UniProtKB/Swiss-Prot annotation:
Name by which UniProt lists this protein: Complement inhibitor RaCI4
Family membership noted in the UniProt record: Belongs to the RaCI family.
Any one cellular-component term (Gene Ontology): extracellular region
Main location as per UniProt: secreted
Source organism per UniProt: Hyalomma rufipes
Tissue and organ distribution: Expressed in salivary glands.
Cleavable signal peptide: 1-24
Disulphides: 37-61, 42-63, 57-78
Task of the protein: Complement inhibitor. Prevents complement-mediated C5 activation by binding to C5. Binds C5 at a different binding site than the other tick complement inhibitors OmCI and CirpT1, and the drug eculizumab. Inhibits complement in human and guinea pig but not in other species tested (rabbit, rat, mouse, and pig).
Subcellular location: Secreted
Length: 96
């Protein structure tokens, strides 16, 4: 084997080792474990008119589907929506 072939083989082996070592699917969890949305499963289905209906998430939660398409039934997980507060002035317009 020539030096170039050995070098190429070493590069490929290193790349495969790095790929195996550094690519893993980490489980996602809600930020607050005690929220109303944690560990709640939701589902997207279609009613008799073909409209998408989401079931299972409490108010203030967002259902994130585990599906690639938007036109299929899917299961998902509920996540808490971020809450923000706005301050208004006496004129009724939001303060900057």
């Amino acid at each position: 084997m020539s030096a170039f072939n050995i070098f190429a083989l070493v590069v490929v082996v290193c790349a495969l080792m790095i790929n195996e070592c550094c690519t893993s699917q980490e489980p996602t969890t809600p930020l607050k474990a005690a929220s109303q949305c944690s560990n709640v499963k939701c589902r997207r289905r279609f009613d008799h008119l073909g409209n998408s209906v989401t079931e299972g998430c409490p108010s203030g939660c967002l259902c994130v589907y585990q599906a690639t398409g938007y036109n299929q039934e899917a299961n998902g997980t509920c996540y808490e929506l971020m809450k923000t507060s706005t301050t208004t002035t006496t004129e009724g317009t939001p303060a900057q």
